[in-house]
């Protein structure tokens, strides 16, 4: 039977290759979209975990997505927080979107307090020396467009929110953001020079986090503020808690599965029509319906497995290329999603082959032999 299956596939090599390519594209589509979407979530969680704070304090009704909400509260609240027991550092921070040259989040920080949470690791240069200085991380520096005038080295000038800034230092990635401005400068650009978006707190002991929460909420004017530990915040940064995330993910996977289904259905159905006489010969020689179905499904399985392998391979190639060309783009491909992608492709292909296999098994041997 295996020789028969391979012979059928090799008899129409172009169609077989197209079917393999279609399944491969389905797998690439699933894995790449999942990698980009989930990569953004996991990267945001990892970056926040690297800031060094233990607690996040946000204004009432603020989104848990830190870059949404502007700078609605006075940065001087940090002075009030620093006076509370068990708080060693209170760092006011602003986060804002920059749409110049792509979507990125700009962080406005008070360098001394933010650095006290966990010190920056400078790979080149140093802290701000003026209001028009900017610090960037190493991945942002590496992702500079090619060509003169686009360099991102210490001393270079980059545009942020339509204004020129000099790069004073390049830091190791993993400290919340990729681009850091003085908090007063970013606030002024947003029209709120003395405000902040949120506050990162460092406690004297992790065991005192609940006490700190109670102290903050008991402070006049802060009773409605949101106080979360970093662990609590990170537990919210999952696909289940992001509006529309899982819906978009399922939609992409559904479209990819439909593509695989239609290609395998069309390919298998055409193959069955072309081999009507061969099917008639097999049935006249005593081949059962189950045997015919088995042959068709085995052909589909071989094509699908080859497509899955090709899809995973080219996704890895894409990951390497994107990692080199776009260092700031997280593109994790987990073993879990490799397996899921393979199962989705296999299910879609099998469903696409069921009707052609059933149709082939039902052919009357006499009619099939008379088919021209």
Locate the predicted segments by residue.
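Short helix-to-coil transition segments within interhelical loops
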Residues: 9, 281-290, 363, 372
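Hydrophobic alpha-helical transmembrane segments of multi-pass inner-membrane transport and secretion
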Residues: 13-40, 242-281, 301-310, 351
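Hydrophobic, regular-secondary-structure patches
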Residues: 28-105, 211-220, 225-226
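Peri-transmembrane interface segments
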Residues: 44-47, 64, 171, 215-262, ...
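The feature marks short, hydrophobic/small-residue-biased sequence motifs that occur predominantly
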Residues: 73-85, 92-133, 161, 180-183
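Mid-to-C-terminal secondary-structure elements
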Residues: 113-121, 138-192, 211-218
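Transmembrane alpha-helical interface segments in multi-pass membrane proteins
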Residues: 269, 277-323, 340, 344, ...
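C-terminal membrane-exit region of the final transmembrane helix in multipass inner-membrane proteins
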Residues: 333-372
